[in-house]
UniProtKB/Swiss-Prot annotation:
Activity at various pH: Optimum pH is 8.5.
Recorded family membership: Belongs to the mandelate racemase/muconate lactonizing enzyme family.
Pathway: Carbohydrate acid metabolism; D-galacturonate degradation via prokaryotic oxidative pathway
EC number: 5.5.1.27
Organism: Agrobacterium fabrum (strain C58 / ATCC 33970)
Protein name, entry field: D-galactarolactone cycloisomerase
PANTHER family assigned to the protein according to its UniProt record, in alphabetical order: ENOLASE SUPERFAMILY, MANDELATE RACEMASE, MITOCHONDRIAL ENOLASE SUPERFAMILY MEMBER 1
InterPro entries in the record: Enolase-like_C_sf, Enolase-like_N, Enolase_C-like, GLI, Mandel_Rmase/mucon_lact_enz_CS, Mandelate_racemase_C, Mandelate_racemase_N_dom, RHMD-like
Cofactor(s) it depends on: Mg(2+)
């Protein structure tokens, strides 16, 4: 069994209403899928976190090391590709591109052996997961406080048990949003906040102290990811558990953050941290440090499927009669090709997502959607 082709599919949809996080503005949704084909006709799919066109370029740069290789040798291939660009970058695009490749290889491996990736990872602990809704970005020409409150009330009505809102736009305004959302969703729905590294240490500590009374499950990315000491200071300086990890990439970045005592909750993104081969190592590191894992998810149905396979195989920590079950991030911002790329969408029904049990990722790609949402040439 040999790899014969590596392809990327650039997807894009321009938004009618742009929106912002604390760190960047979105006027479109853009993602890249990775397709790897083998000499026996088996095809695997993956996805990369981050800017689509640069990721595609790095995937193609890696392809020379992939053609002719046995796709089942995922650990060997991962090490070779990582080493190929090691001197130029141990994080960033070299890892996000490698993630999409690794996911596709595991999809192939699962199809070859007739088993879901979760089974190849060691077995399924669960057949479904509860999801929390992500949204509440700052939209143009609307009142942010009322817009966020009404949006999260809708998510409650859809059956979600938890939601995450965007902050980082200023302490006083953010507190008004948090208060309005809590009032709109009631006292029982879990609420998380995500600053997208938009605060200084002082601002984050002030916000955390004043927001804690609203019953916040975690405070995500309070400061920029390079400042691990700042993370630790925020964690020590206010009462809300601190979360982060989508931008640290790979076991080495996660190890440094965990060693610094930066977070209570680690959020690796399968499409950015190195894929299935790497997230298993990251999960072990988190367990050794007594830190809970809640994967970050921001992409198409391919990423949703990958996250579900990993979460099916996540061992409870600790194993007990009533274990702490993982929860899945479920992006509810506008993205018409998120589910369209799949022949059978992976939707949250009453806030619960069923985990596919077919071979590999357990999904089939809708190639018509790849054509419909193809990114225009530059």
């Amino acid at each position: 069994m040999k790899i014969t082709a590596v392809r990327t599919h650039l997807l894009e949809h321009r938004l009618d209403t742009p929106f912002e996080s604390a760190s960047m503005r979105f006027d479109r949704r853009a993602h890249v899928l990775v397709e790897i084909e083998c000499d026996d006709g088996t095809v695997g799919w993956g996805e990369c976190l981050g800017p689509a066109r640069p990721n595609a370029a790095v995937v193609q740069a890696y392809s020379g090391w992939l053609i002719g290789q046995d796709p089942r040798q995922t650990e060997k291939i991962w090490a070779v590709l990582y080493n190929a660009l090691r001197d130029q970058g141990q994080r960033g695009l070299s890892l996000t591109a490698l993630s999409g490749i690794d996911i596709a290889l595991w999809d192939i491996k699962g199809k070859h052996y007739g088993a879901s990736i979760s089974m190849l990872l060691g077995g399924r602990w669960r057949e479904s997961v509860r999801a929390y809704a992500t949204g509440s970005f700052k939209r143009d020409n609307v009142d942010r406080v009322s817009d966020n409150a009404s949006e999260m009330a809708e998510r409650r009505a859809e059956g979600f048990h938890a939601c995450k809102i965007k902050i980082g736009f200023g302490v006083e305004e953010d507190l008004r949003v948090i208060a309005a959302v809590r009032e709109a969703i009631g006292p029982d729905m879990r609420l998380m906040i995500d600053a997208n590294h938009g605060y200084t240490v002082t601002e984050a500590i002030t916000l955390g102290d004043r927001a804690a009374g609203f019953g916040i499950d975690w405070f995500e990315e309070p400061v920029v990811p390079e400042q691990l000491d700042a993370y630790a200071r925020v964690r020590a300086g206010q009462p809300i558990p601190v979360a982060g990890g989508e931008t640290w990439h790979g076991r080495y970045g996660m190890w440094q953050a965990l060693s610094a005592g930066a977070v209570d909750i680690l959020q690796p993104d399968l499409c950015g941290c190195g894929g299935f081969s790497e997230i298993q190592k990251i999960a072990t590191l988190a367990t050794l440090h007594g830190v809970r894992i809640v994967p970050h998810v921001w992409g198409t149905g391919v990423q949703i499927a990958a996250a579900l396979q990993f979460m099916a195989a996540m061992t409870p920590d600790p194993v007990r009669v009533n274990p702490i079950e993982p929860i899945m991030e479920f992006d509810r911002t506008h993205n018409p090709f998120r589910q369209a790329v799949l022949r059978e969408p992976l939707e949250a029904v009453n806030g619960v997502v069923t985990i596919p049990d077919g071979p590999g990722l357990g999904i089939e790609i809708n190639r018509d959607a790849l054509t419909e949402f193809r990114m225009p040439d530059p």
